[in-house]
Amino acid sequence: MDKKDMLYNKVMMLVAVMLPVCLCFAVPTETMAKKPKKLVILHTNDTHSTILPVSEHLPDTMKAGRGGFVRRVAMIKEERKRNPDLLYFDSGDFSQGSAYYTMFKGDVEIGLMNLMGLDAVTIGNHEFDSGLENMARLFRMANFPIVCANYDFTGTVCEDVVKPYVVLHRNGLKIGVFGLSPKMKGLVADKNCEGVKYLDPIATARKTAEVLKKKEKCDVVICVSHMGWADGKEYDANVIQGSRYIDLVLGGHTHTYMKHLEYVKDLDGHDVPVDQNGKHAIYVGRIVMNLK
């Protein structure tokens, strides 16, 4: 798709009882047929085992008593009634952060995520916290694909449960989705990632996005990323600057709450939108891509 034909609308959804408070935005996308087509995308990141809403006693009254996996399940069911063809992605670190993970090692989180109809999830550093065997066990429990293009799991127990990308179909469109995850050194104990090779995320993104656009003939390419939003060598902005063919980056890792979409120019000078939704499932991002 030609980016000049893309229009994106962003909505932030505050997870309350059922459906939230919204903020709106807009962005660009491409067209395939004479009739305009629309993609509705929900996305989350860094829930950190927040099963129940956060404390009602938080000083920030906009967040107090909100968020959590349980309320998100109900909210997404309501959203699907309005948009049955929506896409839903998670950018990792759904693990670690509450007694539920300490006691059950991720079973509760995966069980609830299985109720949400996720289309793809990437790997955060905290998914490694109970070791590779446990991570592989959880990924096999999942009824959604785990995508990560820059971790090489060859020869490990996760080799057959992680894909570099998936190709999805909605409204007559092909959507390519690939995952990127951060360098493990300094974030993951060596014993918990033994045998896993970290691949350069910029080179990987460039190669994978090209495969999705040129070989798989995808109309839209989405990167579900746990690289983070910050200044440095290996963050979402650097990935975009060193690649082409990516239409949208859904981020995580740095717990950044973006009130609006951020834009970074790719190798061809196109503006690529990036979004991230803080932490603890308080917010769910909603992006509408109108392809005209």
Would you name each region that the model predicts?
Residues 9-10, 198:
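Generic alpha-helix initiation/capping and coil-helix boundary signal
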Residues 14-24:
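Bacterial N-terminal signal peptides
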Residues 28-292:
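Acidic, metal/ion-coordinating pockets
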Residues 10-13, 37:
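Alpha-helical transmembrane segments of integral membrane proteins
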